[in-house]
């Protein structure tokens, strides 16, 4: 995962939200913009739960990102957790990520 930077400021996140393409799944939303460098952000709002649940949701999303890092095109990503994420097993979340990855690859940029 060398060369990956995190999105830090509200301005950086807002840029990806407004200009990026949203890929929805029952467990998370992935915003993506093609870019020259790899930048990533993870978000879990209070709708997901209290701090412990939000942190767990972000860890699950980060594990997905690490697992698929080599297959993802370079760009800016924001993973937004949905409340259903914590109730699902990792295998189902993994299947959804595979579907989204295929949609990203099929899209013409």
From Swiss-Prot:
Short name of one Pfam family: Ribonuclease_P
Reaction catalyzed: Endonucleolytic cleavage of RNA, removing 5'-extranucleotides from tRNA precursor
Top enzyme class: hydrolase
UniProt-listed PROSITE patterns: RIBONUCLEASE_P
SUPFAM superfamilies cross-referenced by the UniProt entry: Ribosomal protein S5 domain 2-like (SSF54211)
Gene Ontology CC entries for this record: ribonuclease P complex
Keywords noted in UniProt: Endonuclease, Hydrolase, Nuclease, RNA-binding, tRNA processing
Domain of life: Bacteria
One GO process term, biological-process aspect: tRNA 5'-leader removal
InterPro entries reported for this sequence: Ribosomal_Su5_D2-typ_SF (IPR020568), Ribsml_uS5_D2-typ_fold_subgr (IPR014721), RNase_P (IPR000100), RNase_P_CS (IPR020539)
GO molecular function: 3'-tRNA processing endoribonuclease activity; ribonuclease P activity; tRNA binding
Gene3D superfamilies: 3.30.230.10
Enzyme Commission number(s) from the entry: 3.1.26.5
Function: RNaseP catalyzes the removal of the 5'-leader sequence from pre-tRNA to produce the mature 5'-terminus. It can also cleave other RNA substrates such as 4.5S RNA. The protein component plays an auxiliary but essential role in vivo by binding to the 5'-leader sequence and broadening the substrate specificity of the ribozyme.
Family affiliation: Belongs to the RnpA family.
Record's subunit section: Consists of a catalytic RNA component (M1 or rnpB) and a protein subunit.
Alphabetical list of NCBIfam families matching this protein: rnpA
Protein name: Ribonuclease P protein component
Organism: Nitratiruptor sp. (strain SB155-2)
